[in-house]
Amino acid sequence: MKRSLALLTVLVMAAACGEEKQQPLAPAAITLNGDVFDVAQAGETIALEVTAPSRPYVTDCPDWIRTEAVGAFADYQMTINLTSQANYAFENRTGTVTLQAGALSRTVTVRQAGREKPEPSVGESAAEAVRKMGAGWNLGNSLDANSGDRTHMWIEASYATPVPANYETAWGQPVTTRALFRMFKEAGFNAIRIPVTWYPHMGTIKLQWENEDWHWDMSTWTEYDVDPVWMARVKEVVDYVLDEGMYCILNVHHDTGDRGEEKKGTAWLVADQFDAAKDRYAALWQQIAETFKDYGERLLFESYNEMLDSYDSWCFATFASPDRYDATVAAAAYAGINNYADLFAKTVRATGGNNATRNLIINTYGACSGDGAWNSHLTDPLTQLALPEEPGHLAVEVHSYWEADKFDAQKADIDRLFSNLDRYIVRRLGVPVIIGEWGGGNVSDEVAARFAGYFSQKAHDAGIAALMWMGLSDGKDRAVPKWTMPLTKDAILKPYLP
């Protein structure tokens, strides 16, 4: 009996030993379930099966591919998901993902098709739209009004729950009415630009009481959704313009611009900081585009207003730097402008509807026009601009401000401005030009009219749509409505009279 029990014990132990899992041998190289993957244009997730002697890590990856480890590294094996974003470009793209495991490395190629190019549009071209716009005007200091200073958020602090009218009237203008635009249309204007500042109406602005004032820590600004009440008001004002039969330009305004010497400003779109803002920027334009996707061709979208570099340089990139020019930062700023323009166009086009062929406006760096001859870099904002898509439904915008009381001394400079726009934009890029803002300073109606008549005639002769910044009807006059500068109004319209 004892002998039988001993034999049984030996057999059980032998069986148990036989059931032990054999530890696999460490591989000598990294092996994958594929070296090249083709993914869908709409985006796709690939399960990359990796076998390696040690835990593999992704060390390099294009920004349109997101990587995520699935589960643990066990038995020298691991799964890594490669998720590609949708490719809204018309061109195919290829990216390389690099894996590292100890001293070993391996690359994976991901290929993604672009969108199919649409059939040639039968809609109005940008050149036709600009030609029809003629003379225009800016509804300034209304929907673009904002606190503007992160250390003094006075509008938000003044109201428990601000409503659109609190912003619209904050800078001294009345609530906008349809009658105002009817007055402009009946006079002969055919285009209105509606500047809109969006940051106060995206997500939540959380205020903190510091140094006896209300501050905004922008790092707490995480949400992207636009307040539907604000969007409804913007839509209402756009409808006013379109209902009067005029062209309407809708933009992203004081989300760009000068942030001041101590960088207290609220501008969050900076030319050489594209990566920091691209997700919010795309989300903003996606919401605007979806809201207006069924609107007709008389509505144009403008990418951004006056976007500056991290030095807040006007005239050309890095002019405000200590040495008055920094080639590295300037290159990043111009590349950033082109990246923002590209993202803007692709985001709008991807929403479909009439946005597939809507005329879009791309602004130069700072909306700089290249006027002047005192520095060789003045034309850089024009020469460094690249188009995000083929010409046809694109226009380029610049801004131009002068001193009307020095008009006689500036005629040659004004002439050179229009010559540069023709040379560096119209002929080089093959797109029309819009002067989205122009003016002659704070002068009398009589002085402004003389300058404005000349400037408007130059724009008319060049086939450029020019929209004056405010002035023509401001403050209490807008509520009537009536003209604040009737002589200037007449001078602007004279070249367009039959």
Describe these PLM feature segments:
Residues A28-T59:
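Solvent-exposed, low-complexity, repeat-rich "mucin-like" stalks and linkers
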Residues E124, V130-G370, D474-G475, I492:
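Active-site mouth of glycoside hydrolases
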Residues E91-A103:
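A short beta-strand micro-motif common to beta-rich folds, especially ectodomain repeats
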Residues L5-A6, L11-V36, T107-S121:
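Bacterial Sec-dependent N-terminal signal peptides
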Residues A52-T79:
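Surface-exposed binding patches on compact interaction domains or structured appendages
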Residues Q85-F90:
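Short, surface-exposed loop/turn segments at beta-strand-coil junctions that are enriched for proline
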Residues V163-A165, A282-L300, Y304-A465, R478-P495:
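Extracellular glycoside hydrolase catalytic/binding regions
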